[in-house]
Structures are given as structure tokens and as C-alpha cells.
């Protein structure tokens, strides 16, 4: 099993189900000194008729004054491969990064996904359907309300 720190739409049970990933032992975790934003260029833009502008997907970046809330997932080797495919690790969209997160039980080492620099775009917002997946996951796992509100604000 591999422990992954999931954030953004990867917290949404329906998204995980679509990827054929079981939500084993999910637990809330906090990644300090990182910031959440919709700064990863969406690879859906060319496929969606409603995309009249470039839209952002979830990403995290180092920032000493911020923190990112998410969940830890215990993934099998085949689920890790599915997640890697979904996140585009083989095509240069995201890369896997080791991190240490804080849980109620203490510090846990995990892997998360971070967008490659050449896939970043500033000052963008997500498509509404994507934002809803992010918010649904955050609410499902009962992340702090002020954090959920900050995600909502980023999406507008």
C-alpha cells in the first residue's frame, strides 16, 4: 500500500469511483507550507465547448504562510498506476512528490501530485463542474469550513 495525500477533486468519492479507486481508510490531513490554487492548465479546454478561456485545475505550491487540507488514501499498486494515469504523470502534467502531512495521529509521510512548471497558468478559475467536485470532496470529508469557503472564493 502507498499513502497518498489527495486534494482538489481527488477527494471527491464520485471522482475516485470513476477512476476505480477505493477510498480505504480516508483521514483528514494538513500539508503545511503549501498553498492550494487552480493554477494547473486544464487539458480539457480544447475538448469542452463551454471553455472559451483557459481554465485551471487544482495544484499546490510551496508557500510558507499557507496550508492545504486534504485526505490520506491507502492505495494498492494498481490504484497508484490508475491515479498516475489520471494525473498525467507519464505525459508531463503532474509529478509525484513526497510530503509530510499532519493528522490527528501525528506526522505521516505520503506522496502527492504537483503540476510541472510548464503546465502552470496564473490568474485562472476552474470550470463550474470541476469546482463542484472539489467542493463536494471537501464537504464530504468535513474539512474546516473556512478552508472550504476559501476554495469557493478561488473558484469565482
Positions of predicted regions on the chain:
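Glycine-aromatic micro-motifs
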Residues: 1-156
Amino acid at each position: 500500500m502507498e499513502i497518498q495525500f489527495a486534494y482538489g477533486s481527488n477527494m471527491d468519492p464520485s471522482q475516485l469511483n470513476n477512476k476505480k479507486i477505493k477510498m480505504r481508510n480516508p483521514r483528514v490531513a494538513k500539508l503545511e507550507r503549501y498553498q492550494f490554487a487552480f493554477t494547473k492548465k486544464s487539458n480539457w479546454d480544447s475538448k469542452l465547448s463551454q471553455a472559451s478561456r483557459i481554465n485551471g485545475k487544482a495544484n499546490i505550491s510551496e508557500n510558507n504562510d499557507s496550508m492545504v487540507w486534504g485526505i490520506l488514501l491507502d492505495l494498492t499498486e494498481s490504484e497508484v498506476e490508475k491515479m498516475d494515469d489520471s494525473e498525467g504523470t507519464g505525459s508531463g502534467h503532474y509529478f509525484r512528490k513526497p510530503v509530510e502531512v499532519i493528522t490527528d495521529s501525528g506526522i505521516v509521510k505520503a506522496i502527492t501530485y504537483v503540476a510541472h512548471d510548464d503546465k502552470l497558468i496564473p490568474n485562472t478559475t476552474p470550470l463550474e463542474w470541476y469546482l463542484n467536485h472539489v467542493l463536494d470532496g471537501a464537504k464530504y470529508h468535513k474539512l474546516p469550513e473556512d478552508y472550504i469557503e476559501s476554495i469557493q472564493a478561488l473558484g469565482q
